[in-house]
Amino acid sequence: MPELVVRHLGLVEYQPTLESMRQLTRERDERTADEIWLLQHPKVFTQGQAGKAEHLLAPGDIPVVQVERGGQVTYHGPGQLVAYLMLDLRRLDLGVRELVTAMEQSLVDLLASYGIEAAPKADAPGVYVAGDKIASLGLRVSRGCSFHGLALNVDMDMTPFLRINPCGYAGLKMVQMRDLLPSPPAFDEVSQRLEQALRARLGYA
């Protein structure tokens, strides 16, 4: 099994992290270890390849960054757990759809460990609780290698989601783990559990 490096990076600025992710993907070869980065970002909107300006309703003072991942606009901020997956899909013998499924199921597994019943939707990537979106996915594949990843709402200020049509869906309600649990979850514990779930679903456990 190829090596997997997992980095818990804490709160890091979006743009330098994006550049580091691009650089790793650009410079890697068949011997480069796969990496998963688990982190938080300061407030930022990111607009995917399919992103339409009309879904940015009122960004205000929050910066907007155009990126090469799939999907529409989303929001990142403190208290949201972001996982970036830099994986050699050919080496893992994984298709993009299989990777998306593994990511979604990892989130379902993680949330189930907290007693939260969540599920993916066939027509809208991400993970949902009773129709409300708790996690978003957006990937890019270059030369058979993935980058970008997923974002799970843990314990955060949700109001910036009201400034956009999340993922291009007007009126889509976003939800977070804190709202579904008797007490706020420990962020570091959620991060560790997501690492374990991703390792298991990707065959690294």
From Swiss-Prot:
<feature type="binding site">
    <location>
        <begin position="136"/>
        <end position="138"/>
    </location>
    <ligand>
        <name>substrate</name>
    </ligand>
</feature>
<feature type="binding site">
    <location>
        <begin position="149"/>
        <end position="151"/>
    </location>
    <ligand>
        <name>substrate</name>
    </ligand>
</feature>
<dbReference type="GO" id="GO:0036211">
    <property type="term" value="P:protein modification process"/>
</dbReference>
<keyword id="KW-0963">Cytoplasm</keyword>
<feature type="active site" description="Acyl-thioester intermediate">
    <location>
        <position position="167"/>
    </location>
</feature>
<feature type="domain" description="BPL/LPL catalytic">
    <location>
        <begin position="30"/>
        <end position="205"/>
    </location>
</feature>
<comment type="similarity">
    <text>Belongs to the LipB family.</text>
</comment>
<keyword id="KW-0012">Acyltransferase</keyword>
<dbReference type="InterPro" id="IPR004143">
    <property type="entry name" value="BPL_LPL_catalytic"/>
</dbReference>
<dbReference type="InterPro" id="IPR045864">
    <property type="entry name" value="aa-tRNA-synth_II/BPL/LPL"/>
</dbReference>
<dbReference type="Pfam" id="PF21948">
    <property type="entry name" value="LplA-B_cat"/>
</dbReference>
<dbReference type="GO" id="GO:0033819">
    <property type="term" value="F:lipoyl(octanoyl) transferase activity"/>
</dbReference>
<feature type="binding site">
    <location>
        <begin position="69"/>
        <end position="76"/>
    </location>
    <ligand>
        <name>substrate</name>
    </ligand>
</feature>
<dbReference type="GO" id="GO:0005737">
    <property type="term" value="C:cytoplasm"/>
</dbReference>
<keyword id="KW-0808">Transferase</keyword>
<feature type="site" description="Lowers pKa of active site Cys">
    <location>
        <position position="133"/>
    </location>
</feature>
<protein>
    <recommendedName>
        <fullName>Octanoyltransferase</fullName>
        <ecNumber>2.3.1.181</ecNumber>
    </recommendedName>
</protein>
<comment type="pathway">
    <text>Protein modification; protein lipoylation via endogenous pathway; protein N(6)-(lipoyl)lysine from octanoyl-[acyl-carrier-protein]: step 1/2.</text>
</comment>
<comment type="function">
    <text>Catalyzes the transfer of endogenously produced octanoic acid from octanoyl-acyl-carrier-protein onto the lipoyl domains of lipoate-dependent enzymes. Lipoyl-ACP can also act as a substrate although octanoyl-ACP is likely to be the physiological substrate.</text>
</comment>
<dbReference type="InterPro" id="IPR020605">
    <property type="entry name" value="Octanoyltransferase_CS"/>
</dbReference>
<dbReference type="InterPro" id="IPR000544">
    <property type="entry name" value="Octanoyltransferase"/>
</dbReference>
